[in-house]
């Protein structure tokens, strides 16, 4: 099972991915659970991550770099774990590229999707999208990067992108709303309840 967490900066997706990973470890054991992230996930991608999040480059060049890192990540980490029957949780994946590079920076959405199809990138089985007010999210963001220098309009476009992804792919995506009004445990419980309702097999030892 491949699960991803998505949302704008400060939405709490990183802590929620960690909480769900720890929850599954208690059920299935640490060796059957893989927690990873993007940009990153491999030695190569982690080295490039710092450059990607700090240096400004052309949006299409950025897209190509992200996809090359993702291909490496899927081939070396995600698919091998899934083939062994492990649960894989990833903090950001394809949807972040669609929302940030597509909706936010204006890269053609079909180009983004076609390039992923070209290199046969696997889509997640389940995606949790954490929706939060833009200004509150940015005030909470801990991992400062170049995107946080963008204006509110940029982040509103990114947020809209995530919302539209959730609407267009309801079988894969579950959107958690009003994050700003909930504490981390409340959000975690809501996510576990959604897993219980849609993927009960994950809760069996």
UniProtKB/Swiss-Prot annotation:
The superkingdom of the source organism is: Bacteria
Signal sequence segment:
none
Q: Name one GO cellular component term.
A: cytosol
A Pfam family (short name) is Thymidylate_kin
UniProt: ATP binding residues = 7-14
> Molecular function terms in GO for this entry?
ATP binding; dTMP kinase activity
Reaction(s) catalysed (UniProt annotation):
dTMP + ATP = dTDP + ADP
* Enzyme class, spelled out: transferase
PROSITE patterns, per database record? THYMIDYLATE_KINASE
Which GO BP terms, alphabetically?
Answer: dTDP biosynthetic process; dTTP biosynthetic process; dUDP biosynthetic process
EC number, UniProt record: 2.7.4.9
Which keywords label this protein? ATP-binding, Kinase, Nucleotide biosynthesis, Nucleotide-binding, Transferase
Q: What does this protein do?
A: Phosphorylation of dTMP to form dTDP in both de novo and salvage pathways of dTTP synthesis.
Family, as annotated: Belongs to the thymidylate kinase family.
Name of the protein in its database record: Thymidylate kinase
The species this protein belongs to is Wolbachia sp. subsp. Brugia malayi (strain TRS)
Gene name of the encoded protein = tmk
């Amino acid at each position: 099972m491949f699960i991803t967490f998505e949302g704008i900066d400060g939405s709490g997706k990183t802590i929620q991915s960690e909480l769900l990973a720890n929850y599954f470890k208690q059920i299935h054991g640490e060796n059957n659970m893989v927690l990873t992230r993007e940009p990153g996930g491999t030695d190569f991608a982690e080295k490039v991550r710092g450059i990607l999040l700090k240096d400004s480059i052309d949006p299409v060049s950025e897209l190509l770099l992200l996809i090359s890192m993702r291909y490496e990540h899927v081939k070396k980490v995600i698919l091998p774990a899934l083939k062994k029957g492990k649960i894989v949780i990833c903090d950001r994946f394809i949807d972040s590229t669609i929302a940030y590079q597509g909706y936010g920076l204006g890269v053609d959405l079909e180009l983004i999707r076609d390039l992923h199809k070209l290199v046969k990138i696997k889509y997640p089985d389940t995606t949790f999208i954490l929706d939060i007010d833009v200004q509150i999210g940015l005030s909470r963001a801990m991992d400062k990067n170049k995107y946080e220098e963008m204006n509110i309009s940029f982040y509103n476009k990114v947020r809209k992108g995530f919302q539209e992804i959730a609407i267009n792919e309801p079988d894969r995506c579950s959107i958690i709303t009003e994050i700003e009004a909930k504490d981390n445990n409340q959000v975690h419980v809501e996510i576990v309840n959604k897993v219980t309702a849609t993927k009960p097999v994950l809760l069996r030892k």
